[in-house]
Amino acid sequence: MEIRILYKAVGRPWQEASIANTLGAMQATVGGYIETARIAKNAVVVCNEEGLIRGLPYNCRVMGTDFVGDIFVAGTKGDEFVDVPVSLGDWQRYWIGGGQ
């Protein structure tokens, strides 16, 4: 089963994507072990847990937190990852102020 995410690679704009709802697919997307940062009741940013110690390049700021390496936003329902609860357009307008 796949989930819909909002994905941002370093130096690239945000884009909509789908990934398999598996740990392996999530790790491949961020390039290592995953760590989550809750940004809403039903959404998290997923990043590389070792990004800072590995010296990954700066990516962007989301909700006042700076992220390094490739990241994605997914929805959550309880302990499960689900489709991201916002569209790319809404994300850019209201959450990150124009896609930075």
Where on the chain are the PLM-derived regions?
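Domain-length accessory/inserted modules outside core catalytic folds
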Residues: 1-100
